[in-house]
Regions:
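H-loop/switch region of ABC-family ATPase nucleotide-binding domains
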Residues: 219-220, 474-475
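ABC ATPase C-loop
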Residues: 176-177, 431-432
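Conserved beta-strand-loop-alpha-helix hinge in the C-terminal portion
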Residues: 239-261, 491
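Conserved ABC ATPase "signature" region
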Residues: 137-155, 393-410
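Helix-to-loop junction immediately C-terminal to a conserved catalytic motif
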Residues: 71, 338
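Conserved ABC ATPase signature
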Residues: 159-163, 414-418
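ABC ATPase NBD Q-loop/coupling interface
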Residues: 85-100, 347-360
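Catalytic Walker B motif of ABC-type/P-loop ATPase nucleotide-binding domains
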Residues: 184-187, 439-442
Protein backbone atom coordinates (compact mmCIF):
# COMPACT_ATOMS: atom_id res chain seq x y z
CA UNK A 1 0.00 0.00 0.00
CA UNK A 2 1.35 3.43 -0.93
CA UNK A 3 1.81 6.32 1.46
CA UNK A 4 -1.06 8.09 -0.27
CA UNK A 5 -3.31 5.10 0.27
CA UNK A 6 -2.37 4.93 3.94
CA UNK A 7 -3.29 8.55 4.49
CA UNK A 8 -6.65 7.95 2.86
CA UNK A 9 -7.57 4.93 4.91
CA UNK A 10 -6.93 6.81 8.15
CA UNK A 11 -9.92 9.06 7.45
CA UNK A 12 -12.77 7.89 9.66
CA UNK A 13 -16.31 9.05 10.26
CA UNK A 14 -16.42 11.15 13.38
CA UNK A 15 -19.98 10.09 14.21
CA UNK A 16 -21.06 6.42 14.13
CA UNK A 17 -23.47 5.63 11.29
CA UNK A 18 -26.10 4.36 13.71
CA UNK A 19 -26.06 7.61 15.71
CA UNK A 20 -26.88 9.92 12.83
CA UNK A 21 -30.28 10.85 11.44
CA UNK A 22 -31.31 8.98 8.31
CA UNK A 23 -31.35 11.02 5.09
CA UNK A 24 -32.87 8.24 2.96
CA UNK A 25 -33.73 4.59 3.26
CA UNK A 26 -35.00 1.77 1.08
CA UNK A 27 -36.79 -1.14 2.73
CA UNK A 28 -37.37 -4.31 0.70
CA UNK A 29 -37.57 -2.29 -2.51
CA UNK A 30 -38.03 -3.93 -5.90
CA UNK A 31 -38.56 -2.21 -9.24
CA UNK A 32 -39.50 -3.43 -12.71
CA UNK A 33 -39.59 -1.15 -15.77
CA UNK A 34 -42.79 -1.33 -17.81
CA UNK A 35 -42.89 -4.44 -20.01
CA UNK A 36 -39.47 -5.56 -18.73
CA UNK A 37 -38.16 -8.01 -16.12
CA UNK A 38 -37.55 -6.82 -12.58
CA UNK A 39 -34.34 -4.77 -12.40
CA UNK A 40 -33.96 -4.27 -8.64
CA UNK A 41 -34.79 -7.09 -6.25
CA UNK A 42 -35.66 -6.69 -2.55
CA UNK A 43 -33.04 -4.03 -1.77
CA UNK A 44 -32.70 -2.50 1.68
CA UNK A 45 -30.24 0.28 2.46
CA UNK A 46 -29.99 3.46 4.48
CA UNK A 47 -27.99 6.65 4.06
CA UNK A 48 -27.19 8.69 7.15
CA UNK A 49 -27.08 12.47 7.25
CA UNK A 50 -23.67 13.58 6.02
CA UNK A 51 -22.79 10.13 4.69
CA UNK A 52 -21.49 9.25 1.22
CA UNK A 53 -22.53 5.84 -0.11
CA UNK A 54 -21.09 4.63 -3.42
CA UNK A 55 -23.05 2.13 -5.52
CA UNK A 56 -20.55 0.13 -7.54
CA UNK A 57 -20.52 -3.02 -9.61
CA UNK A 58 -20.68 -4.23 -13.21
CA UNK A 59 -22.49 -2.34 -15.99
CA UNK A 60 -26.18 -3.26 -16.09
CA UNK A 61 -26.29 -4.42 -12.47
CA UNK A 62 -29.02 -1.97 -11.40
CA UNK A 63 -27.03 0.98 -10.02
CA UNK A 64 -28.77 3.58 -12.19
CA UNK A 65 -32.18 2.16 -11.29
CA UNK A 66 -31.39 2.46 -7.57
CA UNK A 67 -30.46 6.12 -8.08
CA UNK A 68 -33.79 6.61 -9.89
CA UNK A 69 -35.68 4.93 -7.05
CA UNK A 70 -34.12 7.39 -4.60
CA UNK A 71 -34.74 10.54 -6.65
CA UNK A 72 -38.24 9.46 -7.66
CA UNK A 73 -37.75 9.03 -11.41
CA UNK A 74 -38.37 5.28 -11.18
CA UNK A 75 -42.13 4.82 -11.34
CA UNK A 76 -42.88 8.39 -12.46
CA UNK A 77 -40.79 9.54 -15.43
CA UNK A 78 -39.43 6.01 -15.92
CA UNK A 79 -42.63 3.97 -16.04
CA UNK A 80 -42.69 0.81 -13.98
CA UNK A 81 -43.77 -0.85 -10.77
CA UNK A 82 -42.20 -0.19 -7.37
CA UNK A 83 -42.62 -2.40 -4.33
CA UNK A 84 -41.34 -1.71 -0.82
CA UNK A 85 -40.87 1.50 1.16
CA UNK A 86 -38.71 4.52 0.29
CA UNK A 87 -38.25 7.21 2.94
CA UNK A 88 -36.58 10.61 2.75
CA UNK A 89 -35.74 11.86 6.20
CA UNK A 90 -38.71 10.74 8.28
CA UNK A 91 -41.21 10.99 5.42
CA UNK A 92 -42.55 8.20 3.26
CA UNK A 93 -41.55 9.29 -0.24
CA UNK A 94 -45.03 8.52 -1.59
CA UNK A 95 -46.45 11.20 0.73
CA UNK A 96 -44.27 13.90 -0.85
CA UNK A 97 -45.27 16.03 -3.81
CA UNK A 98 -42.85 15.86 -6.73
CA UNK A 99 -41.52 19.35 -6.02
CA UNK A 100 -40.92 18.45 -2.37
CA UNK A 101 -38.92 15.42 -3.43
CA UNK A 102 -36.94 17.51 -5.92
CA UNK A 103 -36.14 20.03 -3.17
CA UNK A 104 -34.78 17.29 -0.91
CA UNK A 105 -32.88 15.29 -3.54
CA UNK A 106 -30.58 16.85 -6.13
CA UNK A 107 -29.99 14.67 -9.20
CA UNK A 108 -27.14 14.31 -11.68
CA UNK A 109 -27.84 12.01 -14.62
CA UNK A 110 -25.40 9.86 -16.56
CA UNK A 111 -26.12 11.98 -19.64
CA UNK A 112 -25.97 15.57 -18.34
CA UNK A 113 -27.53 17.19 -21.41
CA UNK A 114 -30.73 15.18 -20.83
CA UNK A 115 -31.47 17.25 -17.72
CA UNK A 116 -30.90 20.71 -19.22
CA UNK A 117 -33.82 23.12 -19.56
CA UNK A 118 -32.00 26.39 -20.15
CA UNK A 119 -29.69 27.49 -22.93
CA UNK A 120 -26.98 28.89 -20.66
CA UNK A 121 -25.21 28.13 -17.38
CA UNK A 122 -26.77 30.68 -15.03
CA UNK A 123 -30.26 30.02 -16.33
CA UNK A 124 -29.81 26.28 -15.84
CA UNK A 125 -28.88 26.65 -12.18
CA UNK A 126 -31.53 29.31 -11.59
CA UNK A 127 -34.21 27.17 -13.25
CA UNK A 128 -34.18 24.60 -10.44
CA UNK A 129 -34.35 27.27 -7.74
CA UNK A 130 -37.12 29.20 -9.51
CA UNK A 131 -39.22 26.06 -9.85
CA UNK A 132 -38.97 25.58 -6.11
CA UNK A 133 -40.41 29.06 -5.54
CA UNK A 134 -37.27 30.82 -4.28
CA UNK A 135 -37.36 34.62 -4.35
CA UNK A 136 -35.10 36.51 -6.75
CA UNK A 137 -32.35 37.33 -4.26
CA UNK A 138 -32.12 33.73 -3.12
CA UNK A 139 -32.01 32.49 -6.73
CA UNK A 140 -29.17 34.86 -7.62
CA UNK A 141 -27.20 33.96 -4.48
CA UNK A 142 -27.62 30.21 -5.03
CA UNK A 143 -26.65 30.53 -8.70
CA UNK A 144 -23.51 32.55 -7.99
CA UNK A 145 -22.48 30.20 -5.19
CA UNK A 146 -22.82 27.10 -7.39
CA UNK A 147 -20.90 28.72 -10.25
CA UNK A 148 -18.11 29.73 -7.87
CA UNK A 149 -17.90 26.25 -6.28
CA UNK A 150 -17.09 24.69 -9.66
CA UNK A 151 -15.07 27.60 -11.12
CA UNK A 152 -17.52 27.95 -14.01
CA UNK A 153 -17.54 31.73 -14.43
CA UNK A 154 -15.82 31.50 -17.84
CA UNK A 155 -18.76 29.46 -19.17
CA UNK A 156 -21.50 31.99 -18.34
CA UNK A 157 -21.92 33.24 -21.91
CA UNK A 158 -21.40 29.96 -23.78
CA UNK A 159 -24.58 28.07 -24.79
CA UNK A 160 -24.93 24.76 -22.99
CA UNK A 161 -25.20 22.84 -26.26
CA UNK A 162 -21.77 24.19 -27.29
CA UNK A 163 -20.00 22.98 -24.14
CA UNK A 164 -17.75 19.95 -24.08
CA UNK A 165 -19.12 16.80 -22.47
CA UNK A 166 -16.99 17.42 -19.38
CA UNK A 167 -18.18 21.02 -19.10
CA UNK A 168 -21.79 19.86 -19.41
CA UNK A 169 -21.18 17.44 -16.56
CA UNK A 170 -19.89 20.27 -14.36
CA UNK A 171 -22.95 22.39 -15.20
CA UNK A 172 -25.29 19.51 -14.30
CA UNK A 173 -23.59 19.02 -10.92
CA UNK A 174 -23.65 22.75 -10.17
CA UNK A 175 -27.35 22.86 -11.12
CA UNK A 176 -28.17 19.99 -8.77
CA UNK A 177 -26.37 21.74 -5.91
CA UNK A 178 -27.93 25.17 -6.55
CA UNK A 179 -30.91 24.77 -4.17
CA UNK A 180 -28.72 23.05 -1.54
CA UNK A 181 -30.61 19.72 -1.28
CA UNK A 182 -30.32 17.41 1.71
CA UNK A 183 -29.28 14.48 -0.48
CA UNK A 184 -27.40 14.33 -3.76
CA UNK A 185 -28.10 11.33 -6.03
CA UNK A 186 -25.56 11.08 -8.85
CA UNK A 187 -25.11 8.62 -11.69
CA UNK A 188 -21.51 8.40 -13.00
CA UNK A 189 -20.77 12.10 -12.30
CA UNK A 190 -17.09 11.83 -13.31
CA UNK A 191 -17.48 9.86 -16.54
CA UNK A 192 -16.61 12.82 -18.79
CA UNK A 193 -14.25 14.68 -16.44
CA UNK A 194 -10.50 14.88 -16.88
CA UNK A 195 -8.27 13.87 -13.95
CA UNK A 196 -7.94 17.41 -12.64
CA UNK A 197 -11.69 18.08 -12.84
CA UNK A 198 -12.50 14.75 -11.15
CA UNK A 199 -10.10 15.57 -8.32
CA UNK A 200 -11.75 18.99 -7.96
CA UNK A 201 -15.15 17.31 -7.83
CA UNK A 202 -13.88 15.02 -5.08
CA UNK A 203 -12.66 17.99 -3.02
CA UNK A 204 -15.97 19.81 -3.52
CA UNK A 205 -17.97 16.76 -2.44
CA UNK A 206 -15.76 16.34 0.64
CA UNK A 207 -16.47 19.94 1.65
CA UNK A 208 -20.22 19.55 1.08
CA UNK A 209 -20.23 16.31 3.04
CA UNK A 210 -18.52 18.07 5.95
CA UNK A 211 -21.38 20.60 5.82
CA UNK A 212 -23.90 17.76 6.24
CA UNK A 213 -24.86 16.86 2.66
CA UNK A 214 -25.68 13.18 2.13
CA UNK A 215 -24.73 11.49 -1.13
CA UNK A 216 -25.55 8.37 -3.11
CA UNK A 217 -23.20 7.99 -6.08
CA UNK A 218 -23.33 5.27 -8.73
CA UNK A 219 -19.76 5.10 -9.98
CA UNK A 220 -17.06 2.89 -11.51
CA UNK A 221 -14.28 5.46 -11.22
CA UNK A 222 -13.26 5.41 -7.57
CA UNK A 223 -9.95 7.25 -7.10
CA UNK A 224 -11.50 10.71 -6.69
CA UNK A 225 -13.97 9.37 -4.10
CA UNK A 226 -11.57 7.59 -1.76
CA UNK A 227 -11.37 10.58 0.60
CA UNK A 228 -15.16 11.07 0.48
CA UNK A 229 -16.90 7.68 0.51
CA UNK A 230 -17.91 6.03 3.78
CA UNK A 231 -19.20 2.79 2.27
CA UNK A 232 -19.17 1.01 -1.06
CA UNK A 233 -22.18 -1.18 -1.86
CA UNK A 234 -21.43 -3.82 -4.48
CA UNK A 235 -24.52 -4.19 -6.71
CA UNK A 236 -24.88 -7.27 -8.88
CA UNK A 237 -27.97 -8.55 -10.72
CA UNK A 238 -30.20 -5.98 -9.02
CA UNK A 239 -29.18 -6.90 -5.47
CA UNK A 240 -26.71 -5.52 -2.95
CA UNK A 241 -24.24 -8.36 -2.79
CA UNK A 242 -21.66 -6.94 -0.40
CA UNK A 243 -20.73 -3.87 1.65
CA UNK A 244 -17.11 -2.73 1.36
CA UNK A 245 -15.07 -0.26 3.36
CA UNK A 246 -12.32 1.95 1.95
CA UNK A 247 -9.81 -0.47 3.41
CA UNK A 248 -11.53 -3.38 1.64
CA UNK A 249 -11.33 -1.59 -1.70
CA UNK A 250 -7.69 -0.57 -1.28
CA UNK A 251 -6.65 -4.04 -0.10
CA UNK A 252 -8.46 -6.06 -2.78
CA UNK A 253 -6.18 -7.77 -5.33
CA UNK A 254 -6.56 -6.38 -8.85
CA UNK A 255 -8.28 -9.52 -10.18
CA UNK A 256 -10.86 -9.51 -7.38
CA UNK A 257 -11.47 -5.78 -7.74
CA UNK A 258 -12.00 -6.15 -11.49
CA UNK A 259 -14.42 -9.03 -10.90
CA UNK A 260 -16.42 -6.58 -8.78
CA UNK A 261 -16.41 -4.18 -11.75
CA UNK A 262 -14.34 -1.59 -9.86
CA UNK A 263 -11.70 0.70 -11.31
CA UNK A 264 -8.46 1.37 -9.46
CA UNK A 265 -8.92 3.22 -6.14
CA UNK A 266 -5.58 4.93 -6.72
CA UNK A 267 -5.02 7.70 -9.21
CA UNK A 268 -3.47 6.11 -12.29
CA UNK A 269 -0.49 7.89 -13.81
CA UNK A 270 -0.84 8.60 -17.50
CA UNK A 271 1.32 6.17 -19.49
CA UNK A 272 4.31 7.60 -21.35
CA UNK A 273 3.56 6.80 -24.97
CA UNK A 274 5.06 8.30 -28.15
CA UNK A 275 3.47 11.13 -30.11
CA UNK A 276 1.97 9.72 -33.34
CA UNK A 277 3.88 12.24 -35.45
CA UNK A 278 7.16 10.77 -34.17
CA UNK A 279 6.21 7.39 -35.64
CA UNK A 280 5.18 9.06 -38.89
CA UNK A 281 8.65 10.63 -39.19
CA UNK A 282 10.29 7.22 -38.80
CA UNK A 283 7.99 5.80 -41.49
CA UNK A 284 8.55 8.67 -43.92
CA UNK A 285 10.02 6.25 -46.46
CA UNK A 286 6.90 4.07 -46.52
CA UNK A 287 5.25 3.56 -49.90
CA UNK A 288 1.67 3.65 -48.55
CA UNK A 289 0.25 7.00 -47.39
CA UNK A 290 -0.83 7.28 -43.74
CA UNK A 291 -4.37 6.32 -42.83
CA UNK A 292 -5.05 9.87 -41.60
CA UNK A 293 -3.18 13.15 -42.06
CA UNK A 294 -4.30 16.40 -40.44
CA UNK A 295 -2.49 19.62 -41.34
CA UNK A 296 -2.96 23.12 -39.88
CA UNK A 297 -6.49 22.54 -38.60
CA UNK A 298 -8.24 25.46 -36.92
CA UNK A 299 -11.64 25.62 -35.20
CA UNK A 300 -13.54 28.33 -33.35
CA UNK A 301 -16.93 29.03 -31.84
CA UNK A 302 -18.04 32.45 -33.05
CA UNK A 303 -15.08 34.71 -32.15
CA UNK A 304 -13.63 32.32 -29.58
CA UNK A 305 -10.73 30.15 -30.74
CA UNK A 306 -11.06 26.48 -29.81
CA UNK A 307 -7.77 25.31 -31.31
CA UNK A 308 -5.47 26.21 -34.19
CA UNK A 309 -2.64 24.77 -36.25
CA UNK A 310 -3.35 21.17 -35.23
CA UNK A 311 -1.35 18.64 -37.24
CA UNK A 312 -1.47 14.90 -36.71
CA UNK A 313 -0.53 11.75 -38.62
CA UNK A 314 -2.06 8.38 -37.74
CA UNK A 315 -0.89 5.13 -39.31
CA UNK A 316 -2.93 2.00 -39.87
CA UNK A 317 -2.71 -0.24 -36.81
CA UNK A 318 -2.28 2.61 -34.32
CA UNK A 319 -4.62 3.42 -31.43
CA UNK A 320 -4.10 7.09 -30.59
CA UNK A 321 -5.38 8.55 -27.32
CA UNK A 322 -6.58 12.13 -27.91
CA UNK A 323 -6.25 13.79 -24.51
CA UNK A 324 -6.54 17.28 -23.02
CA UNK A 325 -8.42 19.22 -20.38
CA UNK A 326 -12.19 19.63 -20.49
CA UNK A 327 -12.94 22.30 -23.08
CA UNK A 328 -9.66 21.90 -24.99
CA UNK A 329 -11.57 20.99 -28.17
CA UNK A 330 -11.19 17.21 -28.27
CA UNK A 331 -14.82 16.53 -29.15
CA UNK A 332 -14.75 19.36 -31.69
CA UNK A 333 -11.73 17.78 -33.39
CA UNK A 334 -13.41 14.36 -33.31
CA UNK A 335 -16.57 15.78 -34.89
CA UNK A 336 -14.53 17.50 -37.61
CA UNK A 337 -12.81 14.20 -38.41
CA UNK A 338 -16.21 12.50 -38.58
CA UNK A 339 -17.56 15.13 -41.00
CA UNK A 340 -20.08 16.56 -38.54
CA UNK A 341 -18.44 19.98 -38.20
CA UNK A 342 -16.44 22.17 -40.58
CA UNK A 343 -12.94 23.33 -39.74
CA UNK A 344 -12.13 27.00 -40.35
CA UNK A 345 -8.78 26.16 -41.91
CA UNK A 346 -6.51 23.23 -42.63
CA UNK A 347 -6.75 19.96 -44.52
CA UNK A 348 -7.54 16.32 -43.78
CA UNK A 349 -6.36 13.38 -45.89
CA UNK A 350 -7.58 9.80 -45.57
CA UNK A 351 -5.21 7.29 -47.19
CA UNK A 352 -3.68 10.10 -49.22
CA UNK A 353 -6.94 11.59 -50.47
CA UNK A 354 -7.91 15.13 -49.43
CA UNK A 355 -11.44 15.00 -48.02
CA UNK A 356 -14.21 17.55 -47.72
CA UNK A 357 -16.32 17.30 -44.61
CA UNK A 358 -18.93 15.39 -46.66
CA UNK A 359 -16.25 12.93 -47.82
CA UNK A 360 -15.23 12.38 -44.21
CA UNK A 361 -18.71 11.12 -43.35
CA UNK A 362 -18.23 8.28 -45.80
CA UNK A 363 -14.61 7.49 -44.95
CA UNK A 364 -14.32 7.99 -41.16
CA UNK A 365 -16.48 6.41 -38.46
CA UNK A 366 -17.40 8.74 -35.59
CA UNK A 367 -18.82 7.25 -32.39
CA UNK A 368 -20.24 10.07 -30.24
CA UNK A 369 -20.08 10.35 -26.50
CA UNK A 370 -23.85 10.84 -26.34
CA UNK A 371 -24.83 7.45 -27.75
CA UNK A 372 -28.57 7.65 -27.01
CA UNK A 373 -29.21 9.57 -30.25
CA UNK A 374 -27.22 7.10 -32.33
CA UNK A 375 -29.55 4.08 -32.40
CA UNK A 376 -32.35 3.58 -34.93
CA UNK A 377 -33.47 -0.06 -34.85
CA UNK A 378 -35.57 -2.14 -32.40
CA UNK A 379 -32.83 -4.61 -31.44
CA UNK A 380 -29.12 -4.78 -30.65
CA UNK A 381 -28.56 -7.30 -33.45
CA UNK A 382 -30.29 -5.15 -36.08
CA UNK A 383 -28.40 -2.06 -34.93
CA UNK A 384 -25.06 -3.81 -35.45
CA UNK A 385 -26.17 -4.85 -38.97
CA UNK A 386 -27.73 -1.51 -39.93
CA UNK A 387 -25.04 -0.26 -42.32
CA UNK A 388 -23.92 -3.54 -43.91
CA UNK A 389 -25.42 -6.11 -46.27
CA UNK A 390 -27.46 -8.78 -44.42
CA UNK A 391 -25.41 -11.65 -45.85
CA UNK A 392 -23.92 -14.57 -43.93
CA UNK A 393 -20.45 -13.03 -43.86
CA UNK A 394 -21.68 -9.91 -42.11
CA UNK A 395 -24.03 -11.87 -39.85
CA UNK A 396 -21.12 -14.01 -38.68
CA UNK A 397 -18.98 -10.92 -38.16
CA UNK A 398 -21.74 -9.26 -36.13
CA UNK A 399 -22.11 -12.38 -34.03
CA UNK A 400 -18.37 -12.38 -33.29
CA UNK A 401 -18.22 -8.67 -32.42
CA UNK A 402 -21.29 -8.85 -30.17
CA UNK A 403 -19.76 -11.86 -28.42
CA UNK A 404 -16.45 -10.01 -28.00
CA UNK A 405 -18.24 -7.01 -26.47
CA UNK A 406 -20.41 -9.18 -24.22
CA UNK A 407 -23.62 -8.14 -25.99
CA UNK A 408 -24.70 -11.36 -27.68
CA UNK A 409 -27.06 -12.35 -24.86
CA UNK A 410 -28.75 -8.94 -25.30
CA UNK A 411 -29.07 -9.20 -29.10
CA UNK A 412 -32.90 -9.15 -29.13
CA UNK A 413 -33.22 -6.25 -26.66
CA UNK A 414 -34.16 -2.75 -27.77
CA UNK A 415 -31.12 -0.44 -27.50
CA UNK A 416 -33.15 2.00 -25.38
CA UNK A 417 -33.49 -0.63 -22.64
CA UNK A 418 -29.73 -1.09 -22.24
CA UNK A 419 -27.67 0.36 -19.41
CA UNK A 420 -25.31 3.25 -20.13
CA UNK A 421 -22.31 0.95 -20.37
CA UNK A 422 -24.13 -1.51 -22.63
CA UNK A 423 -25.15 1.33 -24.97
CA UNK A 424 -21.54 2.45 -25.07
CA UNK A 425 -20.41 -1.02 -26.12
CA UNK A 426 -23.14 -1.24 -28.78
CA UNK A 427 -21.94 2.06 -30.24
CA UNK A 428 -18.44 0.61 -30.49
CA UNK A 429 -19.82 -2.57 -32.08
CA UNK A 430 -21.50 -0.47 -34.79
CA UNK A 431 -18.19 1.23 -35.57
CA UNK A 432 -16.36 -2.08 -35.75
CA UNK A 433 -19.04 -3.47 -38.09
CA UNK A 434 -18.68 -0.55 -40.50
CA UNK A 435 -16.41 -0.60 -43.55
CA UNK A 436 -14.49 2.49 -42.39
CA UNK A 437 -10.73 2.11 -42.01
CA UNK A 438 -10.44 5.15 -39.71
CA UNK A 439 -12.45 4.97 -36.48
CA UNK A 440 -12.93 7.89 -34.07
CA UNK A 441 -14.60 7.28 -30.70
CA UNK A 442 -15.46 10.02 -28.19
CA UNK A 443 -15.03 8.78 -24.59
CA UNK A 444 -15.74 5.12 -25.43
CA UNK A 445 -15.14 3.95 -21.85
CA UNK A 446 -17.37 6.44 -20.02
CA UNK A 447 -19.77 4.43 -17.88
CA UNK A 448 -17.76 1.21 -18.24
CA UNK A 449 -16.72 -0.95 -15.32
CA UNK A 450 -13.22 -2.47 -15.14
CA UNK A 451 -14.12 -5.73 -16.87
CA UNK A 452 -15.93 -4.06 -19.76
CA UNK A 453 -13.12 -1.54 -20.17
CA UNK A 454 -10.87 -4.57 -20.76
CA UNK A 455 -13.43 -5.97 -23.22
CA UNK A 456 -13.50 -2.72 -25.23
CA UNK A 457 -9.70 -2.44 -25.18
CA UNK A 458 -9.40 -5.97 -26.56
CA UNK A 459 -11.92 -5.26 -29.33
CA UNK A 460 -10.04 -2.12 -30.42
CA UNK A 461 -6.74 -3.99 -30.39
CA UNK A 462 -8.27 -6.58 -32.72
CA UNK A 463 -9.47 -3.83 -35.07
CA UNK A 464 -6.00 -2.25 -35.06
CA UNK A 465 -4.41 -5.60 -35.95
CA UNK A 466 -6.83 -5.75 -38.90
CA UNK A 467 -5.23 -2.54 -40.18
CA UNK A 468 -7.59 0.13 -38.92
CA UNK A 469 -6.43 3.47 -37.55
CA UNK A 470 -8.21 4.38 -34.32
CA UNK A 471 -8.46 7.66 -32.41
CA UNK A 472 -10.09 7.69 -28.98
CA UNK A 473 -10.97 10.86 -27.09
CA UNK A 474 -10.39 9.83 -23.49
CA UNK A 475 -9.49 10.84 -19.94
CA UNK A 476 -9.17 7.21 -18.91
CA UNK A 477 -5.54 6.55 -17.95
CA UNK A 478 -6.24 2.88 -17.21
CA UNK A 479 -7.67 2.45 -20.70
CA UNK A 480 -4.78 4.34 -22.32
CA UNK A 481 -2.28 2.09 -20.58
CA UNK A 482 -4.25 -1.00 -21.56
CA UNK A 483 -4.48 -0.57 -25.34
CA UNK A 484 -3.31 2.77 -26.78
CA UNK A 485 -0.10 2.92 -28.79
CA UNK A 486 0.32 6.72 -28.96
CA UNK A 487 -0.85 9.90 -27.21
CA UNK A 488 -1.75 13.23 -28.79
CA UNK A 489 -2.49 16.06 -26.35
CA UNK A 490 -4.67 18.95 -27.46
CA UNK A 491 -3.73 22.08 -25.52
Amino acid sequence: MTAGATSRTTLHRTVPHEARATAASLRNVSFAYKNAPETVHDVSLSVASGECVVLCGPSGSGKTTLVRVINGLAGSYCKGTTEGVVTLGECDATDLEQWERAERVGSVFQDPSSQFFSSQLAGEIAFTCENLGYDHERVVAATDQAISAFSLDSLRKIPNDSLSSGQKQKVAIASALGPRPQLLAMDEPSSNLDEEAAAHLGRTLARLKAEGLSMVIAEHRLAYLMDVADRFLLVRDGRIEQELSRTDVFAAPDDLRRSWGLRSPRRTARPKLPHPNESATKLSGATEPPALEIRGLRAAYRSNRIFEDVSLTVEAGQIVALIGKNGAGKTTLARILGGLKKAQAGSIRVHGRTCSYRDLRRRVWFGPNDVKAEFFTPSVKEEAMLLVKPDETHKNRARGILHDLDLWELREQHPATLSGGQKQRLSIACGLMSDRTVLVFDEPTSGLDALNMEVVAGALETAAREGRAIIVVTHDSEFIGRCCTHIFELE
